[in-house]
């Protein structure tokens, strides 16, 4: 039985869990001699979701198997089967190494950091975020383009470790088992193959600065962030067991790989295969360390990232799946927003195809889907809170292409007023 709000103070009902009255909440659900409000229901659902998430990744020795990791990744990330397989094995081996590190001291297993290579919007960041969430370890992201060598204007490399420490609530032990994702590493490539008298503080200099923390060192982290001050007490964080995942689009890398495959060089005399013959993702899968070296990464930096996972371009079918299939799919997110207004939202197949094709045309991959949906739904989301008796909003192909207004279904009262 659903109890709605009443103005009669003598018969006021209260939530049996939080004690709020029916006037302070949206809904009260009645049970045998007890009531529970909508806020407590949401809280209970959050607790259950967290417990289910933790249960999914448990295995015999406490380290999730690659298949378990991949299975959970499938719930959130569409496609990229090869990249998910590579990541699952690498992450499993990393945390198995930590779990059994003290048992076998005769052989020391090295750390395998990961390089993610793929076009913009193919899911590099989402894969790293999802891995950290399902493993319940601290996670932080850094943009390589904002980093500079120590002593120059910009962000210190140590600030990455500070962010990880903050994500771990300043628990040093937890932070030392966390995951760091460094995005846009292709933007810190060496500006030229030839040595220069001018110092490259935001390119090769950043690669040099990252070497130590990626390999394993004790970083002195100022608790307040920013540049170091002599008066500050530093926190000591050992980065040996922190997993570093570096990602980048590496635009133009496929041409370097293609020229190697054809035996040619780079320049006017190079014979490069037409990029339309094969998709970029297929070419990137053939990447070798020498290709990354020619792109502008220094040998030491490449050596710190032994595991390389390449991601494919997303086609129309994959983008439509991304819109609808994952647990936190965009269509479901906007559907929930409309539910808060008491309205259901639906997209026709041709509308989804239109959205996917616009993202492909923009070359933004999955990252561009939200902005496209925002543009389509902006007018509706602006008007809807002030409208009455709207039951359903339907987005079809014409609406998605901006040639028509969204289709709205009204409740009985509105129909009665129209007929009158």
UniProtKB/Swiss-Prot annotation:
Zn(2+) binds at residues 15, 18, 37, 40. Keywords: ATP-binding, Chaperone, Metal-binding, Nucleotide-binding, Zinc. GO terms for biological process: cell division; proteolysis involved in protein catabolic process. Residues 3-56 form the ClpX-type ZB domain. One of its GO terms (cellular component) is HslUV protease complex. Disulfide bonds: none annotated. ATP binds at residues 119-126. This is ATP-dependent Clp protease ATP-binding subunit ClpX. It comes from Granulibacter bethesdensis (strain ATCC BAA-1260 / CGDNIH1). The gene is clpX.
